[in-house]
């Protein structure tokens, strides 16, 4: 006899081994000898620890106790905020796929019930066929079990496909979030540039006001200098006219006293001396006035030149101011357009965020419902597996009792069975599978599995 352990999705889903089957073959008949196996399945996570499930299979299974229930991890759906809007487009497809899986599982349950009826029929046939030789009940049972295992594997593959689609949707969500962050950064850069332009406009306005004030002060100073120069010229002209009149009067007086020649001569001498002094004073005064006029003319020329320079600077600044006004108007227009665009984009992003939040809430509810349904299905499947194991043990017990009417072969069968069963019993042990998952902010940061064999 050969001991074989089938490894399939059963192990991946429930973390345990399939019950070992030990076959004893004699001539053309096949008999299944039950081997007692014990398996323990335990799941644990970083956030919560769920109770373990202990299931013992032996030659007899008592059905009076409550059915074991598979423990599931306590899921924190608040960590699933990373799921994005792409789920909405695939939600209907996933729902249809889950409904299809539910229908297939319902058909699987119907088939199991049908197998129960077939088992009853086979038990009746076994009662009739006792003493008539071996039957192909074991082969039929194995064929049905292989078919059921194939269906379970197919369901597992479909489940893996759905999980891959879910991971792809998560990647799309991350890509959209990165794009949203880039758009927000571009908007901040544009706002910073706009603030810089506003500062430049303010500085240009202050410079223009300062230059206008300076031009006004220079114009007032030029007007004051002109007025002062005109007043000085008027005073000089008045002084020159008074001196001419005085000189004429002093020269004419000697002409009135024809009788007094001596006095005339004295006055003539005095007049000539006064005239000479007046001429010298006039020349010196005229030189001073000419020098002052030259200085004033130079000052006026410099003032005019400076005024012309200021006028040119004023014109240049006026042109710059007009250009800055045009630039300011253009920037303000661009600012209004950008604000309108950003407001529309922000409203669109807000709508997208609201839609994403609605989709996330819906997906959370949908995931919770699917998990509850999956838990119920796992519980039903566990109960069905226990019932199938019970019926299998009953069938094996019936087959083992068929061998009792053959006294000549009993010792040989017993020896072969014991010989093949002992190594299988020695190799079987209690296995504990501990799976630990640590999550943070909705992301799995650590996942580990530990297998412990209990002798």
Swiss-Prot record:
One of its GO terms (molecular function) is structural constituent of cytoskeleton. Residues 237-259 are annotated as: Linker 12. It is found in: Cytoplasm; Cytoplasm, Cytoskeleton; Nucleus matrix. Vimentins are class-III intermediate filaments found in various non-epithelial cells, especially mesenchymal cells. Vimentin is attached to the nucleus, endoplasmic reticulum, and mitochondria, either laterally or terminally. One of its GO terms (cellular component) is intermediate filament. Residues 123-144 are annotated as: Linker 1. Residues 88-122 are annotated as: Coil 1A. It comes from Cyprinus carpio (Common carp). This is Vimentin. Residues 87-122, 145-236, 294-398 form a coiled coil. SMART domains: Filament. Residues 145-236 are annotated as: Coil 1B. Residues 1-87 are annotated as: Head. Residues 94-402 form the IF rod domain. One of the most prominent phosphoproteins in various cells of mesenchymal origin. Phosphorylation is enhanced during cell division, at which time vimentin filaments are significantly reorganized.
